Amino acid sequence: MYEYYSTGKIRSLPQQVDSNGINSKPMNSSPSTPIPNNNNNNNNNNNNNNNNNNNNNNNNNNNRNKSQQSFYLNNNNRNCGFSSPTKPQYNNNNNNNNNNNSNYNHSYGGGGGGTTSQFQQHHLHPVNRKPPKFKISYSVKNTLNNTIIPDRHCFGVNSLAYNHRKSILYSAGRDSTIKSYQIGGGDNDNDINEKNEYGFKFKKSFNDHTDWVNDLFFNDSNILVSCSSDSTIKIWNTDSERCVNSLKFHDDYVKVLAYAPKANYFASSGLDSHIKIWDLSICSISQSFSIDNNNNNNHNSSSNYNQFGDTSILKHITNNSQPTNKINNCNINVVNGNINISTNNNNNNSSSSNNNNNNNNNNNNGQTNTHENTAETSDSEGSKDDNQLSSVNKNGIRSNLSNNNFRNIDNIDEYTPPSSVLNHTPKILSSNGRNVNNRENNNNNNNNNNNNNNNNNNNNNNNNNNNNNNNNNINNNNHENNGNVDVDDEDDDDDDDDDDDDDCNKNKKKYDDNNNNNNYNNNNNKKNNSNDNNNDNNNLNKKFSPMFGSGSYLVGKSGGEGISIYSLAIAQDASFVVSGSTERAIRGWDVRSGQKIFKLKGHTDNIRSILLNDNSTRCLSASSDGTVRLWDIGEQRCIQVFDDLHTDSVWTLATNDSFSHFFSGGRDGMIFLTDLKTHQSRLVSRENEPILKILNNQDDQSIWVSTTSSTIKNYGLSNFYDKNQSIDNNTTNCGSISSEILYNNNNNNNNNNNNNNNNNNNNNNNNNNNREKLSTINEDSNGLQVDEPKIKIQGRAGIIKNQVLNNRRQVLTKDNDNNVQLWDITKGKEIESFGKVDFDKKLEEFNEVISIPKWFQVDCKTGSLFISLESPLCFSADAYQTNLGLTPTEDSLINIGESILYSLFSKWIMGYNLIQLNATTNKDNELNHSNDSVNSSLSSNTSGDNNNNNYNNYNNYNNNNNNGLQKSSSSSSIVSTNSTTPNSGRPLIEIMAKKSIFHLPSNTDVVISDETSGLVLYRSRIEEFTGREQIKIIDWLYNCLETSAIPIKRDNQKISFSVEVNEKIPQNLNAPYYIQVRKICDHVLNNFFINPNNNNNNNSSVNNDLPKGEEFFEICLQNKILLPHYTLGTVKSFFWKQNSTIPLTARVKAQYINETELVKYLKQLSLNHNKK
């Protein structure tokens, strides 16, 4: 992993794979291997610059170390999973002496001509990893009369992607889901989702995110990548319709993604100000893991994705031999805790003209033995050719992993938080056992080194035309002196402006030279290498940092602390990435060197969208300042400002493939189509909500539009423009409004001179005028036609307000259509919808006088109702069934959270119990050699009543897995409760029968997540549990289900009160909060009237058949009669909010005024009962 900051400096964050493949152990240097100092590093770099010809010619210099460097762990990047500072030693074993490496900073991530003085070592403190914190959530369905509302988005839709081959639209919603829709004719006519009037049908909902899905893109390999405010990036296989990887490396919301199709890399960024670049060919490797406890090699291929994700319950294992990665001109050898890195610097930024003369003569003499299973390369055997990649896919990326890299774990001790188990550390890359040195060496000799020579020999080998282009760009470094007003001259209050400008000036010439050289070389390669289909891809990957070889990623900060990145664009070959942020500036980063190469200033507010053309020479940016700017990347200046289109923030841009038109939309709800050649603009649509995303579909000349509402629209553009023509000015009633003068006459003349060799000749012709004109729509003009949408995908209302009622089982909600609904979370469904009524009045109407402790949390941020359970909070509420609206034959005390868990995992309990019984009977079968007895025991044990041998074994199993946490029986000085004590001898089915008070719908979604990492570990419906899911790692859940042990004691929440009877001295008592007033009446009846001299409060067995005390007595607090179902907690919360003892008074009801007769009657009843 690499990290670079606003200063342009780089540091390396190496990662270590332990014996089980987990990135959790520090990489300590070998005690016997000395660690080089920094002075030697500088000397080595100088020697490399001065004596590179000799180094290239001498391939026998195998023991020479290049620019060895000690690296230390970044404590801020805690998601790497390291626990202590690291000092890996980086050695070069002459594996990469093929190519000239002048001016190359051999520090990990170098390659941009930097020196070791630019490298910063960080001595940081250890990282303390937090233990996993599990959370169980379940959905409450928005159903009425058992009719499920169609699966549609609620709230806004942040992003869109389109599969042109299959005509499938993917939408990323603020409801945490990604939904796919078949547009027009599909490949599955038997789909249960019927098409509607617009000719589309719903296909699939991807639900693994837990917060807003902010962006997504789709590539040609049917891989969908999404990012979310839950700080994760998820890789989806749209063919199997499941998540194959979850990347949790951002520290905050991930807001934007950018994809480079030629390199198959993508960039991500967000509110943590980091830019990370990933190798999608490695990230998208399917990780289908088994959750079968009895078969670790069985991969679950269920479309419901019934598995603990790809990173949670499983650990990444490697072989005892440490892996060696060889990709993108880098060898990474992990041996005995040391990392040895040999980097081959195909430095495109080299300024020395004499360093590449002997490149074609340099080849490695060593041989590489690649083993399919171990992928281990011995240092003594040499390495592969420097230009070789490990197993090439269609994009030229090699990314084959060895088999059996993952397995299950069965207990919490082996669990490792998902952030450290990701498949983005140095991993086993192979070419399936084939030795590819010969072919790669030939390519290197014949073609690839020619490209290296062309890239490096700017002064000697480029033709005249290329030199002209270089001169054009080089002169732009000093365009301030030529009368041009550089955008960087605008005022900016950033503290790092001076450093940024210096860094940009240092790297600008290098970037411009390389950019032109790459264009020249690409043309050269087409002529010289037409017979080699893989050569272009190989050359493409040679210029990247060696991080991609290990499946790692690039990390950079844009603007320093407190800067949030909202927009991102990457060149199609991933050569550089551009970011826009709250810094109000556009920063460009060279992926090859990891350094900032330019900074474009001009916007006055947050930059919300950035687009690059195909050859990365032009850039469009949209900002919250209401403007759209067109930039020249080579000249690093703004060449046009579109400031008269929108009246508010511009949030999204879209363009066609030729970059001749662009669409813009924003907070004002207006969508404009602008011609970049003629600067003519036309209004396409006016929405009622702010525009979040515009997706241009050139296949049918339409655009997809999403807004802050939940509706997605498609507008046809056949009446607006031909994709091959400019906007028809004759049919567009536009008023010509002059734009702001960006440049004076001298500037325009200079611009024309400097842009002679650029690809935008039409733009240069327009610059002949003294000032550029921008034609925009006059909204009041006649003839303006705004078309109705061709397709409309309706959304649904989402919950925006909720209130948990006092009974802690019902929730009142209000959606964005102002509809008020009542939900019962113990039933898992909607009870009633009241329509558009006053929320507060309904709340007052349904909120009863009752107090039950909080035991769950409500999550409505995605528009749907989810209930979250965490330990020990979920076990905090005990209540009698009558207080929960139930009508049981016996009013027993239950723990609400425990009963909900039994309902959620009822299918798991049944399946797990049968598996355990089956395993036990199989053991008995081996001992008794009797198949008949086994069959009979299996049939009889289905109900869990027979086979003592099985139960004995089951007892031992439970005792071994019990953590010692037992459920406390509730007790007080008044009454003993019916609390269930755990009995490990009973099978789980028998326990479930008594504990399953609530019955949730079988289609209720159950989600298990780790709050520490923010990843979803498991998602399933109740009916889909099999009993093989490894929930043992959640100890509090497993103990609750198996032994009824909960990590909280009921007796620790007692309330003090006193009872005064017949104006006698009050009796001071205390009892748990859940004791009802009727229990106090029973206490008064028994202890003051029937057995006044009996001090033993445990008389319930004697007086069960006697009348209830509530028939004769009433309990009062300050002359207010308390209802029998009130609990002490209710009395304390509503009627006595002081911290002192509650003074209660017991009095005989009015119909029993003669207290003496009442006493005689009660005593007679007691005597008759005792005689019986």
UniProtKB/Swiss-Prot annotation:
Keywords: Repeat, WD repeat. One of its GO terms (biological process) is double-strand break repair via homologous recombination. Residues 37-63, 90-107, 341-365, 435-485, 514-543, 745-769, 930-984 have a biased composition (Low complexity). Residues 1-115, 341-544, 745-775, 926-986 are annotated as: Disordered. The keyword Repeat applies. GO terms for molecular function: ubiquitin binding. The keyword Repeat applies. InterPro entries: G-protein_beta_WD-40_rep, WD40/YVTN_repeat-like_dom_sf, WD40_repeat_CS, WD40_repeat_dom_sf, WD40_rpt, WDR48, WDR48/Bun107. Belongs to the WD repeat WDR48 family. This is WD repeat-containing protein 48 homolog. It comes from Dictyostelium discoideum.
